């Protein structure tokens, strides 16, 4: 049994299936599980197990998601599949299932459909970096030219949303036939696995990214100075490092003169750890919750951005009524609420609970942000929406 322990050393990559209803996302997920476990070992999850997706709650939002795992010789994959369109929307916006790459499933019998387009747009908005296409149900199309036409359509659609439509891998296969164990179609699943391995680059680990710590609390320790505490989101902070305090007010520079965890002094604080960072020459009043401590020049404060937002339904504890332009809720980033105003797209008068919508948000003061940052929309402490920064404007 030494092998299983060794497997953990393989790079871990998060992927998922996206695409129109009934184009075969769940069947493909089951086929990948079956073919890869047969070829490389691992646990098989059948269609019924995947289709019966457990209900999860992410930031108060109900999402049905199935998680499966599989291995190729060089990598370990975690794969998400959702039963309904609404689950995809919620999953992608809340970042409940962050994807390093997505498998877009398009039935060759139908070609691209409305949700195909919507999932590609969502992938663009929430920052899914890579898409691989699996053209499904190819066993049902005899006409070679028709297959070529569908492939061309899908590639054009992806290019329309700034994905490299001409260059990304498109695999023509049949998930059902692969699941039934027909060798020619099983080979297509292995071809898809090969595309995952080669086309999606190994994701950068949190610890290798530039240091960032969202400040949760500030203390002054007599004779030592000011300590900020929080959980390191990414990177490493070492004693002696220069750091910036970003957001809310003008950015200031200081130096980390100590790191402590559970009252012990350390040389560094790493991604995932809760720690206190001692700052040189910083006054207690210079720093507040809602700011971040970061590697200099790695992140900037912004107030205006385009976002993709999911508005909670009444059943999820959201609003019972729509909202209109002029709506001024709080936007909760990392550790703090900031009031902001919204601008709705041309021709949209109101937003109903349960909708997803693109909106431009302007905050009353700046917050440290990058594209892809998640936030909640709150009214008096109650979450009424979830969003993601799609594009920073100012």
From Swiss-Prot:
Any coiled-coil regions, as ranges: none
Q: Which intervals of the chain are annotated as region G2?
A: 60-64
Q: How does it assemble?
A: Monomer.
Which stretches of sequence are listed as region G5? 174-176
The protein depicted here goes by the name Elongation factor Tu
Could you confirm whether the keyword Heme appears in this record? Answer: no
Entry EC number(s)? 3.6.5.3
- Name the HAMAP family for this protein: EF_Tu_B
G1: region residues: 19-26
Annotated Mg(2+) binding lies at 26
Report which superkingdom the organism of origin falls in: Bacteria
One GO CC term, this protein: cytosol
Entry keyword set: Cytoplasm, Elongation factor, GTP-binding, Hydrolase, Magnesium, Metal-binding, Nucleotide-binding, Protein biosynthesis
Identify the Pfam families for this entry: GTP_EFTU, GTP_EFTU_D2, GTP_EFTU_D3
Principal EC category:
hydrolase
Query: What reactions does this protein catalyze?
Result: GTP + H2O = GDP + phosphate + H(+)
Q: What is the lineage of its organism?
A: Bacteria, Pseudomonadati, Pseudomonadota, Gammaproteobacteria, Alteromonadales
Task: Point out the gene that encodes the protein.
Answer: tuf
- Locate the residues binding GTP: 19-26, 81-85, 136-139
Q: Which family does it belong to?
A: Belongs to the TRAFAC class translation factor GTPase superfamily. Classic translation factor GTPase family. EF-Tu/EF-1A subfamily.
Which segments constitute the tr-type G domain?
10-204
